[in-house]
Amino acid sequence: MQVYEETKTTAGLTLSDWTKKFWEWLFQLSEEANPVTVVGPSRPWRYGGRQPTQFQKQCMEKHGESVWFIAPAPYSEPNSVIQLYIPVGNWWFLIGPAIACSSQQLYPSLDSIDKVRNHVNEDIGKTNELWTIFDGFSIPWYYIDNTDKFIEIKNVPTKESKNMLHQNLEEGTIQTLQCGYWNFIEPVVPGEHLLTIHSKSSIYRVDITYQLSVSGPAN
């Protein structure tokens, strides 16, 4: 598997910066709207995750380009086909086929930064199958390692949370470490596009196809 280093800046942010924004977006979604939880109905709209966010809109207005997040959806039905409606514009696509994020607040037994770092690295190290195909072509992976220091994510919804009710979260803030394999696709022409994500490890499996309709309106 060949892994590339991405150095391009998109809308004023590096790929590493955008992966941090991805996790912020994911953790700030309610469980019913979050594509990587099993809480709530498995409806197609949830895989869009209430995008575009205010930050994504601001980037588009300021820079003339922005980034759309596509989650791996590890708890979707095997071989699911999900249609996403995306507004016309210079949208890059950030895809996380095999990614990991961990926190002391979510896993109290990880009582040091080294233990949290080992947790995410071990999770990614278990990946034994990985491929992503866009419009019939395999696309490259970029490995991003954001484990040097904790990354704070605020406004995590914890009230009435079925997954986080037992966690020791103060004011909905968590300190995270993140790493994993990402795909980053340049803006595409309006119309229909097909994205297939497959990844497998000893702890999870992702098999999902997204039909991307770049014509709007957004989900």
Task: Report residues per predicted region.
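Feature for soluble, non-membrane regions of globular proteins
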Residues: 1-14, 18, 27, 54-61, ...
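Extracellular-facing segments of soluble proteins and assemblies that are Gly/Ser/Thr-biased and enriched
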Residues: 65-163
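Extended interaction regions within the primary functional domain
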Residues: 35, 40, 54-65, 98, ...
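A surface/extracellular/periplasmic glyco- and lipid-processing/surface-interacting theme
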Residues: 104-105, 194-196
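N-terminal segment immediately downstream of the Sec signal-peptide cleavage site
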Residues: 1-58, 210-218
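Extended, well-structured beta-strand/loop surface patches
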Residues: 126-192, 198-217
